[in-house]
């Protein structure tokens, strides 16, 4: 999508807040996935650039909720077919909670005292968490040892407002129209 196209309908000539299709991503909108939204009033806004593909059967033209292959669906709560867990009439099955840090049951991550078993989301090593990682990775150049704000390698920046390179939107001299 070019910077001149509306984020809601994909057409050029107007900005999202002036979109004639109405709606928006704000309050009252539910994500449909793959670039579309459904409003509380039932209006659907779908990106025309991506077709609806059913993740259940892999065919285009419908979504999983409308798929004919739903007979294989089983409830995660009771294990029987014909419904899903949110519609299950059986009492909610208690599942043992596991810690996201160490993976052990019986406590949550915030109560974990297995600090030496904590896994860093940045480097993948155990013994520390991301905020304490010494092997930080720069998002600008991809190298380890520094973060983007301290990166010495210059990269071309583009303005989201006018599309020109060399400055950011907050530094743009062209007045925003949207």
UniProtKB/Swiss-Prot annotation:
Residues that bear N6-acetyllysine: 8
InterPro entries from the UniProt entry: Znf_CCHC, Znf_CCHC_sf
Transmembrane residue ranges: none
Source organism superkingdom: Eukaryota
Modification Omega-N-methylarginine occurs at: 25, 27, 80
GO cellular component: cytosol; endoplasmic reticulum; nucleus
Keywords: Acetylation, Cytoplasm, DNA-binding, Endoplasmic reticulum, Metal-binding, Methylation, Nucleus, Phosphoprotein, Repeat, Repressor, Transcription, Transcription regulation, Zinc, Zinc-finger
N-acetylserine PTM sites in chain numbering: 2
GO molecular function, one term: G-quadruplex DNA binding
Zinc finger (CCHC-type): 4-21, 52-69, 72-90, 97-114, 118-135, 136-153, 157-174
GO BP, sorted A to Z: G-quadruplex DNA formation; negative regulation of transcription by RNA polymerase II; positive regulation of cell population proliferation; positive regulation of DNA-templated transcription; positive regulation of transcription by RNA polymerase II
Pfam families: zf-CCHC
Subcellular location: Nucleus; Cytoplasm; Endoplasmic reticulum
Main localization category: nucleus
Protein role: Single-stranded DNA-binding protein that preferentially binds to the sterol regulatory element (SRE) sequence 5'-GTGCGGTG-3', and thereby mediates transcriptional repression. Has a role as transactivator of the Myc promoter. Binds single-stranded RNA in a sequence-specific manner. Binds G-rich elements in target mRNA coding sequences. Prevents G-quadruplex structure formation in vitro, suggesting a role in supporting translation by resolving stable structures on mRNAs.
Entry protein name: CCHC-type zinc finger nucleic acid binding protein
Organism in which the protein naturally occurs: Mus musculus
Gene behind the chain: Cnbp
């Amino acid at each position: 999508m070019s910077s001149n196209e509306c984020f809601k309908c994909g057409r050029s000539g107007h900005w999202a807040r002036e979109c004639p299709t109405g709606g928006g991503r704000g309050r009252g909108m539910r994500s449909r996935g793959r670039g579309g939204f459904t409003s509380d009033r039932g209006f659907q806004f779908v990106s025309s650039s991506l077709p609806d593909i059913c993740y259940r059967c892999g065919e285009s033209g419908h979504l999983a909720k409308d798929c004919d292959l739903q007979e294989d669906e089983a409830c995660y709560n009771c294990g029987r077919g014909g419904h899903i867990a949110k519609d299950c009439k059986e009492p909610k099955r208690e599942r043992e909670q596991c810690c996201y840090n160490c993976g052990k049951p019986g406590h949550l991550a915030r109560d974990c005292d297995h600090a030496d078993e904590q896994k860093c989301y940045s480097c993948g090593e155990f013994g520390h968490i991301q905020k304490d990682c010494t092997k930080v990775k720069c998002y600008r150049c991809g190298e380890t040892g520094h973060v983007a704000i301290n990166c010495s390698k210059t990269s071309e920046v583009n303005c989201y407002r006018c599309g020109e390179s060399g400055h950011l939107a907050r530094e743009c001299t062209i007045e925003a129209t949207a």
